[in-house]
């Protein structure tokens, strides 16, 4: 009888497993430790609350600015909507223009010879270095902000599309042509699927660069946006609003990255498999 009970207990232990992976568990543990240290430093007043308010104060302020009271004549959701609108418009423009440009560069040495020097000349320059030019040429309105974000996203997207085309195995292209496929069919059914993993990776990189550029671009003559909210709060020494805004910026960037990763896994399930 005791043997049966021990076997059942042993099998029960074997069936139960920690639901989270080791990496996720370590990440959550790290965040918990950081929050605990932050709370302890604030509770012991090792740093003035003016410079480092406690986590509960930041959370309370976040809930306040998310409500009707808002901050700087707009709620948190209105600031967030303004930022997301800018990044989405710039990302769509980079996708519509950057991917075809990268594919054309990968397929045509002539096109690559014309466009590659231009992209390689402007790509190493930090996007914010172009901000004064954008303001001079396009004013301080929305166009300059969206165009600056587009400039930041375009190069990673175009160069990733180029790398994706170059990574397609030539034997597959020759096999498709030998079976009578037209150029359009080879492009659509062979080259694009083969280049898609690199293209999506470029989108992830470009979105990260574009999001950081967006926050900086909103410091210039903006009336709404997460960057504007953080900058305005800093001018009034509202550290709790600054930290709340930084937390929202980080969370949105993390969610966008997770979304693109999920899209990449769905569209390219074969990526990473041994060919």
Positions of PLM-derived features:
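Alpha-helical membrane-protein architecture signal
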Residues: 59, 73, 77, 81, ...
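Generic hydrophobic transmembrane alpha-helix motif, especially the helices
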Residues: 120-156, 163-164
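Short cytoplasmic-facing helical segments at TM-TM junctions of multi-pass membrane proteins
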Residues: 160-205, 226
